[in-house]
Regions:
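Glycine-rich adenosine-cofactor-binding loop
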Residues: 6-21
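NAD(P)-binding Rossmann-fold cofactor-contacting core
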Residues: 26-46
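Short acidic low-complexity segments
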Residues: 51-62
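ADP-ribose/adenylate-binding Rossmann-like module
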Residues: 67-74, 85-103
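Rossmann-fold NAD(P)-binding glycine/threonine-rich loop
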Residues: 79-84, 97-134
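Conserved anion/nucleotide-ligand pocket segment
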Residues: 136-202
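Substrate-binding/catalytic subdomain of NAD(P)-dependent oxidoreductase enzymes
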Residues: 172-268, 273-275
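A conserved regulatory-domain signal marking ACT and ACT-like small-molecule sensing domains
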Residues: 306, 312-400
Length: 400
C-alpha cells in the first residue's frame, strides 16, 4: 500500500486555501495536512477548527511530518520556519519569494548541509513550471537571456488600463478585489515582487546568487493614462518586464516597465497571466505562458512541488555549482553584473527638477504641455538606481 505523506502547513491565506482545494481534489498525490498554523484566532475558515493551531511548535516539534509547507506573508518568520525545518532534517516547500531572495546563500548551504530539499516553484512564475524547466530541460543549455512578466497583479492592472480605458487607481482596486494584489500593493506595483522572482530565475538560468539591493527594480505605481496612450499610438503595450541577459562575460539584470512591440510573444500575455521567454544558443527562443496570480494556480504549483518530494526530487543547481568551480568557491556574484551601460527610456515628469539624479546622455524626443511632459532619452543605467524604492518620486520611467 502506498504511503500517505504527512504535511505541516504554515499559512491559510490565498495560496494556502488554494493548496487545500487542489489537494482535496487530487487523484494522484496521497497526502494529508496534519496541522495548519495561522495567526488570527477569530478569522472564519471553511474547514474544521481541529486542523488549526496558533503555535508554530505544534508543527516544528512534530517528528512524524514528511514535508513542511510554508505559505505565510512575512519573510522573517518564514525564514525561521524554513531554516528550523531543514535543520531538523525535513524538506520544505515554500512560495515566499522575498524570503528566498533575501537569504538565498544561506538557504542553499542549509540544503547541502542537511541533505534536504527546498522546493519553490510557486514562488517564481505562478502556475508556470519555469524553475523545473530551467533545472532540467535547460540544465546543459548555454542560455543567453531570460525575460518575462512575473507579476500577475501588474499585468492585470496594465491590461485593464489599456483595453478598458480604466485609470490606474480603479484598475488597482479591481486587482485587489480579485485577490491578485494585496491591500498594501507596494511590493507588487513598485517592482519588488518581480525583482525577487527575477533573482530566483537568475540563480537557475546563470548560476548567480544576487542580492535584492544589487538589482534595479522600477515599477508602475506612477503610471498614468497618458503613458498608456503614448504607447498605443506607437504600437506598443507597456509591460513590467524582468530581464537577465548575458553580455560578454557579464550579466545585465533588472526589472522595469518596457514598451513591448507586437512582434514579442509577451505582447499578447494579458490580465493576470505571466509569460517567460527563455533564449539559448541551441534551443533558440521559447515562451511559457500561464496564470500568474490567484489562489488555485499558485496552489497547484505548490502541490506539484510536494508531489516532486515524494520521489526525492531536489534542485541540482548545476549552473550555480559550475560557476563557483570556475571561481574557486564562493564569490560575490555582484562582480559579474554590468551596470555601466546606456539604456533608452521614456520618462514622463512634472518638471525638469524631477529629473535630477538621472544622468541623461542624449535626448531623442521631447514633448511639453500644460498637461504632461515627457522625453525619450538615452541615460546612464546606473543612475536609475536613484529611483528604486523612492515613494516620493512621481516620475514614470519605461524602457523603449
Amino acid at each position: 500500500m502506498e504511503k500517505r505523506i504527512k504535511l505541516g502547513l504554515f499559512g491559510f491565506g490565498c495560496v494556502g486555501q488554494g493548496l487545500y482545494d487542489v489537494l482535496s481534489h487530487s487523484e494522484g498525490l496521497k497526502a494529508d495536512i496534519e496541522k495548519i498554523c495561522v495567526k488570527d484566532r477569530n478569522k472564519k475558515r471553511k474547514i474544521d477548527a481541529k486542523y488549526f493551531t496558533y503555535d508554530k511548535e505544534d508543527i516544528l516539534g512534530r517528528k512524524n511530518l514528511d514535508v513542511i509547507v510554508e505559505l505565510i506573508d512575512t519573510s522573517e518568520a518564514a525564514f525561521e520556519i524554513v531554516t528550523r525545518a531543514m535543520n531538523n532534517g525535513v524538506s520544505v516547500v515554500t512560495a515566499n519569494k522575498k524570503m528566498l531572495a533575501e537569504n538565498f546563500e544561506e538557504l542553499f548551504h542549509l540544503q547541502e548541509k542537511n541533505n534536504v530539499a527546498l522546493i519553490y516553484e510557486g514562488s517564481a512564475g505562478g502556475s508556470i513550471p519555469i524553475i523545473r524547466n530551467l533545472e532540467e530541460y535547460y540544465d546543459n543549455e548555454l542560455l543567453s537571456s531570460i525575460r518575462g512578466l512575473l507579476n500577475g497583479s501588474c499585468n492585470y492592472i496594465l491590461t485593464r488600463m489599456e483595453l478598458e480605458n480604466m485609470d490606474y487607481n480603479k484598475a488597482l482596486k479591481m486587482a485587489q478585489e480579485q485577490g491578485f494584489a494585496e491591500s498594501d500593493p507596494w511590493l507588487d506595483v513598485a517592482g519588488y515582487d518581480t525583482l525577487y522572482k527575477l533573482i530566483l530565475l537568475t540563480v537557475h538560468s546563470f548560476g548567480l546568487i544576487l542580492k535584492p539591493e544589487q538589482v534595479l527594480a522600477l515599477g508602475i505605481q506612477n503610471i498614468s493614462f497618458d503613458d498608456i496612450t503614448y504607447a498605443k499610438e506607437k504600437g506598443y503595450r507597456i509591460k513590467l518586464i524582468a530581464t537577465a541577459h548575458k553580455v560578454g562575460n557579464k550579466f545585465r539584470v533588472y526589472a522595469m516597465p518596457h514598451f513591448v512591440s507586437k512582434e514579442s510573444d509577451l505582447y499578447s500575455v494579458l490580465y493576470e497571466n505571466n509569460g517567460v521567454e527563455v533564449e539559448g544558443a541551441y534551443s533558440c527562443k521559447q515562451t511559457f505562458v500561464g496564470k500568474g496570480a490567484g489562489s488555485h494556480p499558485t496552489g497547484s504549483a505548490v502541490l506539484s512541488d510536494i508531489s516532486a518530494l515524494t520521489y526525492q526530487y531536489k534542485y541540482a543547481y548545476k549552473k550555480l555549482k559550475k560557476l563557483r568551480e570556475q571561481h574557486n568557491g564562493n564569490f560575490d556574484a555582484g562582480t559579474l553584473l554590468d551596470t555601466d551601460f546606456e539604456i533608452k527610456v521614456y520618462i514622463r515628469f512634472a518638471n525638469k527638477e524631477a529629473l535630477k539624479g538621472i544622468e541623461i546622455v542624449s535626448v531623442e524626443e521631447e514633448f511639453k504641455s500644460s498637461k504632461t511632459n515627457y522625453i525619450i532619452a538615452s541615460v546612464k543605467f546606473k543612475s536609475l538606481f536613484s529611483l528604486k524604492g523612492n515613494r516620493d518620486s512621481k516620475l514614470f520611467v519605461c524602457a523603449v
